[in-house]
C-alpha cells in the first residue's frame, strides 16, 4: 500500500501526474470527486475537462515560452499534449483543441492503463500517511480548502476567473463577418482562416463600450474582493480601465482585411475561434465576462454579425483558490509541513492549462522517483519547466505572490545578447535553444538515474 501514489483531482495536472507516474511503473489511484460532487464550471465527469477556453495558446517553440513548454512536454511523453495534438483544431499559430474528444481521450487512456485506477470520491482531509499529490485546481472543494487552511495557518489565497461565451456557428451572419487569422498566419488555408471576424466602426464600438459599462454584473459575496488574474480579465473590467483598452486588447483591428468592405478599416474587431472539430461552435476570444445572463445576450447581440446569434453557453465567473507556494512548498513541490504530500497544477499558482499540466508532469515524475528510492537531478532552471517550478517554489516574492503564466521573464538572461525590442527575436531563440538542450539532458539523466 505504501508504494501506491494517490492523486486527488483529475484535471490537467492530476491526469498528467498519474500518467507520468504510471509510465514509471508506479501504481496510481486518481480520486476525482466529479461527477459525484460537481462544480460551478464543470459539465461532465471526464478527466482533463476544459472549462474555460479551448486554447493551449501559441505552439511556437522558438519564439514563445508556452510553445516551448509544449515542446518539453511532448519530449517527456506527456499525455495532455498527445491528446491535444490528436484533437487539434485550426487556430493560426495557436494550439486549439476539440474539448470533448480531448477529455474523452485522456479519460480513456488513463482508464485503460494497467497501473491506473480511478475512483469517484471527494477527499476532504490531508492524509498523514502514504504518497499523495493534490491537484485539485482552482475549484478546490470548500471542505478540502478548509483542511488546507487549517494546516497552513493562513487564509487561502484567491482570485476570480471568468468564462467566455460560445455561439452556434449557423446563427452568425456571414454577410457581415468573415474568416481570417490575424496577418494570415498559418501554413495551410485552414490555419489562415481559423478565426471568424466581426468588424465595428467607431460609433458601434462606442455604443458597445457604453452597453458593457451599463450592464448588470454578478455581485460578489460579502468579504470577497474582485481580484482577477490579468490574463483572464472580464471584458467589462477591461472597459472600466479605459474606453480604448479593448480596442488595444482582444478587439484590436490589426492584421485583418474585411472582404465585404476591403477599403474600409475597421475601428475594432471581435474575433471568434472554432470550439469543436465540426465547426458548429465558436467561442468569443477574450470575452470572458461577469455580466448577468440577460445582459450578456443583449450586449453581445449588438456585435455586427451576431445580431441573431444563439448561445450554446453564456459566460460566468467563479472563485479560484491557490496556495502561497513559495512559503508552503519545497523545491520538489512537497508541503513543508507534510512532506508526504505534493501539490501540482493551478492550485500551486501557475495559470493556464499547459502550465498546470506541466507541473503535474513534474510532480508525477518526482513522486515516482521518491517512491522508487531514486534521486532525480534538479530540474534545470534554464528549461521552461524549471523556470516555472523555480518561480512557484521560491523564485517569486511570497508577499506579492499571484498566479503566473510561463513567460520569458522567468528565464535567466543569456549573456551577450542585445536587450529591448530589436534584440528580442535573437534573445527568445537563445532562450529556447538553451532550454531544449537543458531539458533533453535532464530527461536523459532522469531516465538513467
From Swiss-Prot:
The protein's Enzyme Commission number: 2.1.1.74
One of the protein's GO biological processes: tRNA methylation
Keyword ATP-binding assigned: no
Reactions the enzyme catalyzes: uridine(54) in tRNA + (6R)-5,10-methylene-5,6,7,8-tetrahydrofolate + NADH + H(+) = 5-methyluridine(54) in tRNA + (6S)-5,6,7,8-tetrahydrofolate + NAD(+); uridine(54) in tRNA + (6R)-5,10-methylene-5,6,7,8-tetrahydrofolate + NADPH + H(+) = 5-methyluridine(54) in tRNA + (6S)-5,6,7,8-tetrahydrofolate + NADP(+)
InterPro entries: FAD/NAD-bd_sf, MnmG-rel, MnmG_N, TrmFO
One Pfam family hit: GIDA
Record key words, sorted: Cytoplasm, FAD, Flavoprotein, Methyltransferase, NAD, NADP, Transferase, tRNA processing
Cell compartment(s), UniProt: Cytoplasm
Signal peptide: none
Residues noted as binding FAD in the record, renumbered to the chain: 9-14
Biological function: Catalyzes the folate-dependent formation of 5-methyl-uridine at position 54 (M-5-U54) in all tRNAs.
Family, similarity comment: Belongs to the MnmG family. TrmFO subfamily.
HAMAP family: TrmFO (MF_01037)
Official protein name in the record: Methylenetetrahydrofolate--tRNA-(uracil-5-)-methyltransferase TrmFO
Gene from which this protein is expressed: trmFO
